[in-house]
UniProtKB/Swiss-Prot annotation:
Positions where Phosphothreonine occurs in the chain: T235
Name the UniProt record assigns to this protein: POU domain, class 5, transcription factor 1
PTM statement from Swiss-Prot or TrEMBL: Sumoylation enhances the protein stability, DNA binding and transactivation activity. Sumoylation is required for enhanced YES1 expression. Ubiquitinated; undergoes 'Lys-63'-linked polyubiquitination by WWP2 leading to proteasomal degradation.
Species annotation: Homo sapiens (Human)
Practical uses of the protein: POU5F1/OCT4, SOX2, MYC/c-Myc and KLF4 are the four Yamanaka factors. When combined, these factors are sufficient to reprogram differentiated cells to an embryonic-like state designated iPS (induced pluripotent stem) cells. iPS cells exhibit the morphology and growth properties of ES cells and express ES cell marker genes.
Gene of this entry: POU5F1
Residues given in the record as DNA binding sites: R157, Q164
UniProt-listed Gene3D superfamilies: Homeodomain-like, lambda repressor-like DNA-binding domains
GO terms for cellular component: cytoplasm; cytosol; mitochondrion; nucleoplasm; nucleus; transcription regulator complex
Amino acid sequence: MAGHLASDFAFSPPPGGGGDGPGGPEPGWVDPRTWLSFQGPPGGPGIGPGVGPGSEVWGIPPCPPPYEFCGGMAYCGPQVGVGLVPQGGLETSQPEGEAGVGVESNSDGASPEPCTVTPGAVKLEKEKLEQNPEESQDIKALQKELEQFAKLLKQKRITLGYTQADVGLTLGVLFGKVFSQTTICRFEALQLSFKNMCKLRPLLQKWVEEADNNENLQEICKAETLVQARKRKRTSIENRVRGNLENLFLQCPKPTLQQISHIAQQLGLEKDVVRVWFCNRRQKGKRSSSDYAQREDFEAAGSPFSGGPVSFPLAPGPHFGTPGYGSPHFTALYSSVPFPEGEAFPPVSVTTLGSPMHSN
């Protein structure tokens, strides 16, 4: 305690004025100027922002001088992040090439040298700029060929009556990989990357050859379109038809094949649609019945706490009840362990205040 009191007293102004007052410096008061210039023991930390050779290294101005107030002196306390700083840390300087523009170095006021590019990076840039002229000519020739082929593909497709989606489906039939309509559209518009255009071109060339030679390609395309439409189609049942199916399910949850066909004819649905609906409805009923059985078992088990309800009185003092209702202020809780006889809580008188509107 004595050490703490001494340290606090050393850094607080005296009650009778500053060190320059008529009373002179007192033994418990340390002048801020002396505190700011304290160097500390050799090899130990210095105190204050003005310690060491130049505070410009940290990019902050030195601490302002003390300000005069009425009857005393205020000092500049230690700032955030500038507390006890080792002397060795003040002597560290930034390495060359890392100092930013406009930051002066500490050695003779010389400005840092600008960052130089490594020779490896320059070499790579030169290699990129100095491309082989023969390769560039080949790439340009390939681009022209791709443009001409894209125009030919579009003309052939429109002439034969194929859509872009049909071209993608027939590519799947012929080569086992279906392409989307967006891909064919982007190929014709030359919006794909150069690599993807080169990969897709041989497949489309084979499609053009098949379209010219194979007369059944249109029929194959239509059949594949129907198959894809069946895969993508999602069954939607009207509310009226769904209500009729619910009534039939209540009468017969598991109909036979003949009954399913009869129901499909009456409601205008496919047999598979009716069969799948009844299967899904039975599964839904099983899930709901299992949930109901679990709920009944939980309710039959009762409360997880042993013992009956115990009433605990509230803390003594006035309690405001709901206006118009004179109910006792007790909270019903369940105790995990029943209280033995003779250890019940003593009765506490509770004053219940009525509603302010009906009070006399």
